[in-house]
Amino acid sequence: NTLHILPIHQPGKMKAMGTAGSLYSPMDLLGIDPNLIDHNDSRSDKEQFKAFIDECHKRGIKVMLDMPSCASYDMFLEHPEWMAMERDGLAKTPQGWNDIRMFQPWEDEGKRTLNPKLLELHKEYVDMCIDLGIDGIRADVARAKPVEFWDVLIPYSRMRDPEFGWLAETYTYEDASPQANMPYDRPQDSLRAGFDTIYGQYHIFHEWPNAKTFTNYIKEQLEMSYKLPKGKALIGSFATHDDISPMFHGGADYCNLTMGLQATLPMLSPYIVDGYQSGDYYVYPYENTQNQNTDTDTHEMTVHRGQLDIFNLSRKPGGNQPEIGKFMTSAFALKDKYADIINKGTFIPLEKKGDKNDQIIAYARHLNGKTLLVVA
């Protein structure tokens, strides 16, 4: 079991989104947000965080920390040597995210020479994580750095901790990026560079028109895995913090459907966002209202409707349908009971009769004479 913790750094205050600032617009990659610290505790911020990680480990839970791909405007002003610039000298900003500024991974892109100062910052980040006892890193928008960057950073982490894990936020092969100022996505390249796990495309499951589309995607991922070292996998990215609540796609039934799939699919580690287990719609009454109390230079309480609020001091996630969590628990119990078949068995799509619109998913998992049948 692994706990994925969203970025812990103090958000930037300038040109911010929300009254707390985005978790992905850090002021200091090597610092901890004072809002996360108990100021009545005599221990330092990192001592408190390490104690939290130690308690996770006592419970058999590993901890993965989310590493932002970009910087705040505050960091851009303080450390221009790390930052990417447009030809007119202005900061480079990824399309749709006006509160963050992109790093410059290259010293000379033509010669494929990395920016040594940015690389050193990220090595210090890795050192911080390992010193705290963190077990791995989720690399936000992994394609924002070239393969050469990861070719250095990932082996560096494993010189200190051979078991250190890496999850790449990378989705699907792109000939060209649809997003301005953002490189194209190449999941297979990320896995070759040393990432253990990727996001994949399950977040668009609700858009797939039929079971064949779903099955073909699984086959594509399995075929990709045959070209890579053993052990590469996807997370069950049916709903991450970047997506709207699965409750909007069909309520508790949809949540249970996707959890049953997550528990039985090949090459997949189940993944949930806090609040899923009780049916949180992530709807906030203060959405896009004005608030006189703010920690940033804006009074607007920016919210992406239906998504976990990462811009304001918010409530604890939670909904009103605990039966989702009960089904999740039973699905995980099934995955544990048949771990050998699910983790090592073959994936066999099954023929169906009478399903004219191809809406029924049916497959078997088979290993050493044992077969697990899945119908959804």
Features from the language model and the residues they span:
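Active-site beta-loop-alpha junctions enriched in small/polar residues
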Residues: 8, 68-70, 142-144, 169-173, ...
